């Protein structure tokens, strides 16, 4: 995975004046000084975390430029747990992706003890040596947990890496840091936040969320869900977006957990885009240890499953949106909503095409209400059913963040007389929603269904080019 960028200090962020094309993000880990003031609002001041999970970070110095900040992270369950993961679809799958797949397949999603992550080096396209390095990381955590594996194929810890592609890990440094991290395992908010920092590369802030909830079978029992993620560039799904680890103390069987994660990811981490590039390393893992007790979720037909699906999907969307808000060089957070589609898949495909369009993204950066670019993207969307897009019944509008009336740009294929002053005011805001109505504004019109698809993306700025032109420096 290419994200060798960590918070502003694991590789310091150098902020340049606007005349110098904005901020250059060198590999750096976000710290209290380097985090932009505008991003501080996304960092939680407190949290409630799932029982039985302990986390920690430690400094290994994976990149020589990092002399003090944590770049190895551990998320461990005190007891064996169920686990599921969704991985990148990139053909050049990194060593940690391959090893984690093997661990899950060997154990059928059961008996997993945690995840080990390093930032600063992706361990991708590194041959057999890279695979051995990833296996050693997993085995080292098992050893620290007091459950040493009987061999490289019998480990119980998933592995993730993020950083520059094509370089071998400084594996001795990492193996030396793992026991240090393990000795510091804790469940406090500050420890969770520090661990979220340790997995960053060019991120400008740590991405961490937690929440409590109840389930129908146990209305008086409190459950917790926590998640951390990293990513700011090389973000485009299937499944390729970033690294993410979600933990819950709900008892869930491996098969039900896999179904829950697949549904949630399709509507969250697989519905975001920063630059349209699919990474080699990206992984989202979900761990459930059942430490809070109660009735186990074992089938997809129970009320608890339905409730958990809604809770997990909403949570994953919030976590994924933090990645977009930290997009490299981004100045805007855009939601594109395609409605009145015959199917969710078609609506999502159209929304994805709009989100990937460089012309749409640059127009939004320039605060230009150039809806023709949006229409163009709708028109060339691939893989959708015949008759889904009919120009004469297509409408496009901007939905302002302040809740005021939509600014209609196109109605039933006919352009509106756009109030350019109002359009300019709307585009000054950081947040914007683009609404594409495929049914001419009438739900179910002319046989269309009422399905909708959502996508979240950011704009393209001068800074994006600067950051990625200097990525390895």
Swiss-Prot record:
The active site is at 241 (nucleophile). The lineage of its organism: Eukaryota, Fungi, Dikarya, Ascomycota, Pezizomycotina. The keyword NAD does not apply. This is Arginine biosynthesis bifunctional protein ArgJ, mitochondrial. The record marks 162-163 as: Involved in the stabilization of negative charge on the oxyanion by the formation of the oxyanion hole. This protein may be expected to contain an N-terminal transit peptide but none has been predicted. Keywords: Acyltransferase, Amino-acid biosynthesis, Arginine biosynthesis, Autocatalytic cleavage, Mitochondrion, Multifunctional enzyme, Transferase. Heterodimer of an alpha and a beta chain. One of its GO terms (biological process) is ornithine biosynthetic process. Belongs to the ArgJ family.
């Amino acid at each position: 995975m290419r994200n060798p960028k960590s918070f502003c200090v694991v590789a310091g962020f150098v902020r340049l004046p606007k005349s110098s094309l904005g901020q250059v993000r060198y590999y750096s880990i976000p710290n209290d000084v380097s985090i932009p003031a505008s991003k501080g609002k996304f960092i939680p001041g407190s949290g409630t975390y799932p029982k039985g999970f302990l986390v920690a970070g430690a400094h290994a110095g994976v990149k020589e430029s990092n002399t003090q900040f944590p770049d190895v992270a551990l998320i461990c369950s005190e007891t064996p747990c169920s686990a599921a993961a969704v991985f990148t679809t990139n053909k050049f799958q990194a060593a940690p992706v391959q090893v984690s797949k093997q661990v899950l397949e060997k154990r059928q999603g059961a008996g997993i003890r945690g995840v080990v992550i390093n930032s600063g080096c992706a361990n991708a396209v590194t041959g057999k040596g890279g695979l051995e390095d990833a296996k050693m990381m997993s085995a080292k955590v098992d050893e620290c947990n007091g459950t040493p594996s009987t061999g490289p194929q019998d480990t119980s810890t998933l592995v993730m890496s993020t950083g520059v592609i094509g370089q071998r890990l400084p594996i001795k440094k990492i193996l030396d840091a793992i026991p240090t991290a393990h000795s510091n395992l804790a469940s406090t908010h500050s420890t969770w936040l520090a661990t979220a920092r340790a997995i960053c590369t060019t991120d400008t802030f740590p991405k961490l969320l937690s929440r409590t909830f109840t389930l129908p079978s146990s209305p008086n029992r409190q459950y917790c869900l926590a998640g951390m993620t990293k990513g700011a560039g090389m973000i485009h799904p299937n499944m390729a977006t970033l690294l993410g680890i979600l933990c819950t103390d709900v008892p869930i069987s491996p098969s039900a957990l896999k179904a829950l994660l697949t549904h949630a990811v399709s509507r969250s981490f697989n519905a975001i885009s920063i630059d349209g590039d699919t990474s080699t390393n990206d992984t989202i893992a979900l761990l459930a240890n059942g430490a809070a007790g109660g009735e186990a979720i074992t089938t997809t037909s129970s009320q608890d499953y339905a409730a958990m699906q809604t809770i997990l999907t909403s949570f994953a969307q919030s976590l994924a949106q933090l990645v977009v808000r930290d997009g490299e060089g981004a100045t805007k957070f855009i939601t594109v909503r395609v409605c009145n589609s015959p199917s969710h898949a078609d609506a999502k495909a159209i929304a994805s095409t709009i989100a990937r369009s460089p012309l749409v993204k640059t127009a939004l950066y320039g605060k230009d209400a150039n809806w023709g670019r949006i229409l163009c993207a709708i028109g060339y969307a691939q893989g959708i059913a015949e008759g889904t897009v009919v120009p004469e019944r297509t409408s496009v509008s901007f939905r302002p963040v302040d809740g005021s009336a939509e600014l209609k740009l196109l109605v039933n294929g006919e352009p509106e007389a756009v109030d350019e002053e109002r359009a300019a005011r709307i585009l000054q805001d950081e947040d914007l929603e683009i609404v594409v109505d495929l049914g001419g504004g009438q739900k179910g019109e002319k046989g269309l269904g009422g399905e909708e698809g959502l996508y979240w993306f950011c704009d393209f700025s001068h800074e994006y080019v600067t950051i990625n032109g200097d990525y390895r420096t």
